[in-house]
């Protein structure tokens, strides 16, 4: 009789742990997006702050910005508290770097791109979390396509073709739409394969928040270029 009583209890505990993990991961990812938006607004409305990214210092900031995701992911399981702080700092820096978009695109364009990105992200993250179908192959194909896209974008930096760049934006949206779903499923599975301890759960949640934040940011950037095709301030 005790065996029958314990089985439902273990299932309930597993569900509670998973729900707690998902709440932390998506909650921290959402907080990072919010901090980026606030940071972008303050920098965009303050010429003095925006000018801090001009000159040689911008290269230092750019290097730090590229290094942060690797540091956060590498330290998340060992030092989750430090990684959480670094994730939030990274979100603030990202928002500050993107504040210049306010000089290029109209407020309506930025808002449309943001709302569209949020809608696509929520739908695909939900799908990736609840679907029983394995998205590992989709994720691998999307990652390969992303590498090819990066190479093509570097080549187009020399060609400077606006049309090619515009087409790449649609490709980028497709890639990060797929990655959002596959990453959501992969991170859920990563938690389920862990020991479920508090430290492991928090560390994986931070890694997931960083990964999904990057998916959202890239989705936003590509949609911004699409919607901004005829709605820039130029």
Task: Name what the model sees in each region.
Residues 1-234:
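A hydrophobic alpha-helical transmembrane-helix feature that marks the membrane cores
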